[in-house]
Amino acid sequence: MVVIRLARGGSKKRPFYSIVVADSRYARDGRFIEQLGFYNPIARGGEIPLKLNLESLDAWVAKGAQLSDRVKTLAKQARKAA
């Protein structure tokens, strides 16, 4: 099954997440099919906290990809901001 989920990056105590399309059997931070954007939960000042390609997201959902719970919430935020 294809899922759209967060892959953790960044350093210790400073998380940074990539929003990726991946097969559910792959490791969380492992192989992925496509990167759709990023999420920075501790963005400050002029940093961008969330960037998400909604067109690609909708295309993958139309193909049958499932969204993780957190990505659903982030997609709502991105649509509201757009």
From Swiss-Prot:
InterPro entries: Ribosomal_bS16, Ribosomal_bS16_dom_sf. GO terms for molecular function: structural constituent of ribosome. GO terms for cellular component: cytoplasm; small ribosomal subunit. It holds the Pfam family Ribosomal_S16. It comes from the Bacteria. SUPFAM superfamilies: Ribosomal protein S16. Coiled coil: none annotated. The keyword ATP-binding does not apply. GO terms for biological process: translation. Keywords: Ribonucleoprotein, Ribosomal protein. HAMAP family: Ribosomal_bS16 (MF_00385). Belongs to the bacterial ribosomal protein bS16 family. PANTHER family: 30S RIBOSOMAL PROTEIN S16, SMALL RIBOSOMAL SUBUNIT PROTEIN BS16M. This is Small ribosomal subunit protein bS16. It comes from Alcanivorax borkumensis (strain ATCC 700651 / DSM 11573 / NCIMB 13689 / SK2). The gene is rpsP.
